[in-house]
């Protein structure tokens, strides 16, 4: 995997994808009887000379905290087309999701399997920064279709908090 595929959070910088997967597994191992939601979402901000994208990866231990990290992407031009911007946001989320699906999701699931009778569960979602209100409503079918074709549940506003809240906070 390319060196540019690096993540960070407020505690750690320069995490490789493998580092991120180890952090996720360690978080789950602390409480393998819990229910988890692993979500990925991307948001963007257009600046004068470039467009900044942030992909957020968020593992929520339902009712008991979360662990997350971020990845920067920069396009060296302002992107004013809403369709292009949302399409790139979706593509960046798909890229991270594809890496997780490549054996890594099973690693996390394997940690929870012995405890499924005690409440252990894992849901994997991609959160899109689109919704039924506003200009993005015309993009819902296309973008959610790209996610569901990967076998992943797609969430839109108001349920897509990893994109519109977590990632958004770091695009400014």
From Swiss-Prot:
Pfam families from the UniProt entry: RNaseH_like
Q: Which InterPro entries match?
A: Phage_KVP40_Orf299 (IPR007405)
Protein known as:
Uncharacterized protein YkuK
Gene of origin? ykuK
């Amino acid at each position: 995997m390319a060196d540019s595929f690096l993540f960070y959070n407020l505690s750690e910088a320069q995490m490789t994808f493998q580092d991120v997967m180890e952090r996720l597994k360690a978080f789950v191992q602390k409480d393998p009887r819990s229910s988890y939601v692993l979500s990925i979402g991307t948001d963007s901000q257009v600046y004068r000379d470039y467009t900044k994208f942030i992909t957020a990866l968020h593992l929520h231990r339902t009712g008991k905290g979360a662990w997350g990290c971020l990845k920067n992407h920069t396009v060296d031009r302002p992107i004013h087309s809403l369709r292009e911007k949302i399409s790139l946001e979706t593509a960046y989320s798909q890229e991270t999701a594809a890496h997780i699906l490549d054996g890594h999701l099973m690693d996390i699931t394997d940690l929870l399997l012995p405890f499924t009778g005690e409440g252990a569960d894992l849901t994997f979602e991609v959160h899109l920064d689109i919704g039924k209100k506003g200009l993005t409503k015309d993009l819902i079918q296309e973008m959610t279709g790209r996610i569901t074709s990967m076998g992943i549940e797609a969430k839109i506003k108001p349920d897509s908090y990893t994109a519109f809240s977590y990632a958004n906070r770091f695009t400014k």
